[in-house]
Amino acid sequence: LKVELRKGGHKVTMSDVLAFAGVSVVRGQNRLLDDVTWEVEEGERWVILGPNGAGKTTLLQIAAARMHPTTGVVGILGEVLGTVDVFELRPRVGLASASIAERIPGGESVGNVVVTASYGIIGRWRESYDRQDYARAMGLLDALGVAHLADRLYGTLSEGERKRVQIARALMTDPELMLLDEPAAGLDLGGREDLVARLGVLAEDTEAPALV
């Protein structure tokens, strides 16, 4: 799929996964992003580098359809942000970030933290899940080396364990695009190396989503 986007003078040929054209974000007197043009093709793996305050998190929040730019055009998985129901689009994008992690109840079991992503919610309410949902959640936890923690309360986990649970949650909906916002932040050297190794395995999987 190739779609030519035009809006406010901006033009871009949108890839299957992600396309920014002339994207800027302004908050008060601060320009968080300035005229960003960027494309991510299917199967690509990207690493975004920059100092604190450079706009990395803002960029990923837009890519996850959780923020709109001040100016410019954003294409996500063949849809144009601002013309699509974001509640239908968001489940197609996996996001692991501090903004989501801080909303996870400490008293929720690890298994529930992951399986509730099926409904795009945080914390159990009155929804029900089938065996396939639980099997997928356990499979993801196992792939990330934390299946043995499924019955533990999220609030009792170490920072490294929480990071892996967050990634499992982000993968629960089988997303077409996976966004990881500073996945190794707060980890010691050993925890960072372990997480990077597991992400490396994910990145090498030809069936895995585009990864940023």
Descriptions of predicted regions:
Residues 80-94, 130:
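ABC ATPase NBD coupling module
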Residues 72-82:
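Conserved ABC transporter NBD signature motif
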Residues 167:
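Hydrophobic anchor residue at the start of the ABC signature
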Residues 178-182:
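Catalytic Walker B motif of ABC-type/P-loop ATPase nucleotide-binding domains
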Residues 174:
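Conserved catalytic motifs of ABC-family nucleotide-binding domains
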Residues 128, 153-157, 161:
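Conserved ABC ATPase signature
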